[in-house]
A protein has these predicted regions:
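Beta-rich carbohydrate-recognition modules and glycan-binding surfaces
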Residues: 1-138
Length: 138
């Protein structure tokens, strides 16, 4: 009866510096589900991520929704500027920028929550099986 399932990468050490790129490209077999791709960035020793980690278990994530094909592989480009800052699936409105030079972790999740105040139309309860083939940059 939970509202989401997710998987996270290990925390990157050293941090990923992707500042010479424009975005991510994901190849995924998602079986028609709408997934969320989340990215965490480090904002310094006493930065925003640490502030939000103290306020919530999920912390600050930069998120994009990914609609997948029912059959076969979905290839989707996620420009850095399309990522939205969120905490606990809620968009936040702070004057912060995505830090492509200090990426600390990736997350892929399937949630019953979609855009703020809405349910995810691609959510299906029950067993889930998807194949993340690759995450690359362009």
């Amino acid at each position: 009866k939970g509202g989401f399932v997710s998987c996270k990468s290990p925390i990157f050490s050293p941090l990923l510096n992707l500042s010479s790129y424009q975005g991510f490209e994901l190849k995924i077999e998602g079986k028609g589900r709408t997934l969320k791709f989340g990215v965490s960035c480090k904002y310094g020793i006493l930065g925003l991520k640490e502030f939000f980690l103290n306020k919530s278990p999920g912390g600050l994530r930069w998120v994009a929704e990914i609609d997948t094909k029912r059959f076969g592989t979905t290839i989707i480009k996620v420009p850095f500027e399309s990522l939205e800052p969120t905490v606990l699936a809620k968009k936040i409105s702070l004057p912060i920028k995505f830090k492509s030079d200090s990426i600390s972790q990736f997350q892929l999740l399937h949630s019953k929550f979609g855009r703020p105040g809405e349910l995810n139309p691609g959510f299906k309860p029950g067993k889930i099986n998807f194949l993340l083939q690759s995450i690359s940059v362009y």
